Amino acid sequence: KKEISMIILAGGASSRMGRDKSDLTIDGKTFLEMQIEKGEKLGISDILLSGYHGENKYKYPIIPDRFPGKGPLGGLEACFRKAKNPYCLVLGVDVPLVPAEELAALIRQSLHSDAKAVILSHGGHEEPLMGVYRTELADAMLEEITLRKGAVFAFLRKNGYECYESQAVAWYFSNINDSETYKEIAGNH
């Protein structure tokens, strides 16, 4: 995994949760720790924490957005410029149950693909914030967030992407955005 960095999107205040999702826990581990561990398990050493507002108890750098308020693309743009490798595994902090094996399969496909981005798809749902992007997209991202709305899918369509079709159970991809989902997931774990 020498050629791949990892970006964990840990910014974005959660208005619906009323607190930072990164610091929510399942079985005593924070969502952020769970995602970091997946990266480490995959052998990735260049891990960047995008927009994390908590206290940095981690050995990885926190990268602030260069253009705040631009959503996930703003976070990615800043991180892509700091990443040490030509590819970046991008993972939101709010999908803590995604198995490392699925990410490994996603990485394998992206390293053999000509597409500039390969995102995970399950049961017809495309997940742009679970993907492998080429870091050379940083300038195109800058253009997207400064000249246009900074919409992730519009950006992907413009630059070309393909999907890795996951056969894993949909539950693994639960996006934990509100207290009800969190209670359900934490309770079932």
What does each model-found stretch correspond to?
Residues 189:
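ER/Golgi luminal nucleotide-sugar-dependent glycosyltransferases, focusing on the catalytic module
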